[in-house]
């Protein structure tokens, strides 16, 4: 065997690289990427829900699946999370948590099926026990219920899983998710957690349960981002006390942009979410561009990433073009720049210690309902 044939036999290729060891046929397999878990609040995050009074809460169990309306862009985003994970051969899990009663479970599952949403679990709050015992002030208490369920879910999650959390600005999601992230990271001592939960006036039985669960958690800084849907249009500056990990967003196009920078959804997913807003919510391309610029101003997108995304989305026809080049020169420029782009290195998000007692005082002074209502 001579020439190239002999060389190929002696120095075989392994994948796309030449092996340095004569006769070597394989290389060590790459480690599987870490599993990723997406935990979604259901009401006012996935669904447009209305239960601000007891009468409206009682009406919810009688709604049909077709009566329920999803938030604009959320269906396209969740589909993309699953699709992208499959393409990357990464294990991905989507879970929903709802403070609504389990009696609406059938309608919710039918709604998710209608939307074509693949999910791995859903949990509801059993309100009946509070009604039977006359404990009406715990009907709307969410902190204890959600925190306990999140901790249970973390214990059952794959080791090393990275998490992204999705909630809204109506009541307690920012503080619930932040507490959860700090507890599983080992940043919050058990006694400090108990003091915080007492201040929030949660169900005493839940407090005991949460303390026991927190002792079973293997510490891991697993929560990468917390997304808060600004359904009430709360000023984003009010969330600065929660740190850079928490991202307040005005729409799911903004959420998709940050997830794209995080590397969990491709650009095509951002385009799909943006188009769903154009088609279903009377958004204009100019308004989508303003959404991107808003994220950049608030420093949730790096400046170079924002510039790159703006150009890519202009080329996709999603944003109005602001360039002076024609279409063909722009495409040549984009191809050249992509070839020179280095792999994105995602630095750790700086997480300053949250002063929970002070934060609770400030939020309750503003009229926000964080924990259980006073007796």
Predicted features and spans:
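Alpha-helical substrate-recognition element adjacent to the catalytic core
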Residues: 2-8, 15-138, 210-213, 217-229, ...
């Amino acid at each position: 065997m001579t020439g190239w044939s002999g060389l190929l036999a002696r120095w075989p290729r392994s994948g796309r690289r030449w092996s340095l060891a004569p006769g070597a046929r394989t290389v060590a397999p790459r480690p599987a990427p870490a599993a990723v878990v997406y935990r979604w609040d259901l009401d006012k995050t996935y669904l447009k829900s209305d239960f601000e009074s007891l009468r409206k809460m009682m009406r919810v169990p009688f709604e049909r699946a077709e009566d329920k309306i999803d938030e604009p862009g959320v269906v396209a985003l969740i589909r993309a999370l699953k699709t992208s994970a499959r393409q990357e051969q990464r294990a991905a899990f989507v879970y929903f948590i709802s403070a609504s009663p389990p009696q609406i479970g059938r309608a919710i599952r039918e709604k998710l099926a209608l939307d074509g949403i693949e999910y791995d679990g859903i949990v509801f709050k059993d309100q009946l026990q509070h009604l039977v015992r006359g404990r009406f002030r715990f009907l709307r208490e969410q902190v204890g219920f959600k925190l306990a369920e999140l901790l249970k879910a973390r214990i059952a999650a794959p080791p090393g899983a990275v998490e992204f959390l999705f909630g809204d600005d109506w009541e307690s999601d920012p503080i619930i998710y932040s507490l959860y992230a700090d507890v599983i990271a080992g940043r919050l001592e058990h006694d400090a957690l108990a003091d915080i939960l007492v201040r929030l006036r949660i169900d005493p039985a839940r407090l005991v349960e949460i303390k026991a669960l927190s002792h079973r958690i293997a510490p891991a800084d697993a929560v990468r981002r917390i997304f808060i849907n600004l359904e009430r249009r709360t000023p984003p500056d009010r969330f600065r006390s929660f740190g850079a990990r928490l991202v307040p967003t005005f729409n799911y196009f903004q959420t998709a942009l940050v997830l794209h920078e995080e590397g969990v959804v491709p650009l095509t997913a951002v385009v799909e979410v943006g188009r769903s807003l154009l088609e279903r919510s009377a958004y204009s391309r100019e308004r989508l561009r303003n959404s991107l610029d808003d994220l950049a101003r608030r420093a949730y997108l790096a400046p170079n990433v924002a510039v790159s995304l703006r150009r890519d989305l202009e080329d996709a026809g999603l944003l109005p073009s602001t360039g002076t080049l024609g279409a063909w020169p722009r495409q040549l420029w984009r191809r050249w720049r992509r070839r020179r782009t280095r792999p994105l290195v995602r630095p750790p998000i700086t997480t300053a210690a949250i002063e929970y007692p002070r934060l609770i005082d400030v939020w309750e002074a503003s009229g926000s309902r964080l924990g259980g209502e006073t007796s």
